[in-house]
Amino acid sequence: IADMQREGLIRHVGLSEVSVEQIKIAQQYFTVASVQNRYNLVDRFSEDVLDYCESQNIAFIPWFPLAAGSLANEGSVLDEVAKRLGAAPAQVALAWVLKRSSVMLPIPGTSKVKHLEENVAAASIVLSDEDFAALDAAGKAEWNKTQA
């Protein structure tokens, strides 16, 4: 891969489902343009990878970025923020992902035009620092439950 990149046959190299250590090893051989790991409001397994990508200015592409687990339930923090903003919970979950890091590049999958339109509109949702922190805390608490 490194030789092909040097020869111009490959312009950019991305990695998927890797650890920080694996990224560092890859960086010894070629420039890493992006990392695609599972990450969302409640799945924080790749938190350290995202932080490392941010420090290295590597694009981070979260797969399954809309997952919110029980946070999407009626009366949850996510539900309350969504209602207050006049948005769908999935839009707020996506807005949280977008605000989380400047290197974040979510590409949520969808099979319906309505959901595509909602996903695009999520980019214009502005979360206050308080809403972001409340969602972050709720997501971490949910994540911690799954790790116990």
Task: Locate predicted features.
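Beta/alpha (TIM)-barrel catalytic core signal, keyed to glycine-rich beta->alpha loops juxtaposed to Asp/Glu
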Residues: 1-148
